[in-house]
Amino acid sequence: MAWTSTLPAHLLNLIKNSKYVHVATCSKDCIPSVALMNYIYVPGEKLFGQTDNKNDYIIFVSPQDTQKFYNIKENPKVALLFHDWIIANNLSVGKESISGTPTPTSIPHEEQRQSELLNLLQELNQAELNQMSASIGGETEIVNPESEESKYYKDLILKANPDAKAFIFEKNTAVVKVRIDNARVSNNENRTMFLSKGKS
């Protein structure tokens, strides 16, 4: 059984089912970069042509002419951010601006806030809102773009993200596999837990 089975159930569900992940990379000169990516979660037993019973993987497609890809080639260590916080547009519902810049709308302030709050409450399933985030540490492997393995993973990513077909099968892209090595989990009460293969 993969060590990731020790992760909180909600977090594991979040990793398996979210549409996007923030991918943080770093060059050999320690210059960081971050990108928002479509991805899939692949259990070790469903890897192409092999079985890994101890690890699970995050897999995404990247253009080969990006800083992110250059960084991965130079430094295979990456960090991945998953979260279920309220989306950024809705976070402003409970926050007052200190910039002094007027809001570009003719709707009265209080009425606008009530409308935003109503929309927010309509969108949220309170039973599902756990407000948890996790930074996943892992090591990458670039898959040969001409291989059957690459096609296998691209097909899986397409199945999960059909709206990204043009990007997934764009020329000069490559599949990147990230082995999940550790996780730092935080919630909205600033409680943090660290889990890794050695501590599972």
UniProtKB/Swiss-Prot annotation:
Q: Which cofactor does it need?
A: FMN
Q: Which domain of life is it from?
A: Eukaryota
Which keywords does the record carry?
Answer: Cytoplasm, Flavoprotein, FMN, Nucleus
Residue numbers binding FMN: 60, 68, 125
Principal place of residence = cytoplasm
Matching Pfam families: PNPOx_N
- Membrane among keywords: no
InterPro entries for the chain: PMP_oxidase-like, Pyridox_Oxase_N, Split_barrel_FMN-bd
Q: How is the cofactor bound?
A: Binds 1 FMN per subunit.
Does Cytoplasm count among this protein's keywords? yes
Subcellular location per the Swiss-Prot or TrEMBL entry = Cytoplasm; Nucleus
* GO CC terms of this entry: cytoplasm; nucleus
Instruction: Mention any additional remark.
Output: Present with 358 molecules/cell in log phase SD medium.
Protein family according to the UniProt entry:
Belongs to the pyridoxamine 5'-phosphate oxidase family.
Name the record gives this protein: Pyridoxamine 5'-phosphate oxidase homolog
Give the organism the record lists.
Saccharomyces cerevisiae (strain ATCC 204508 / S288c)
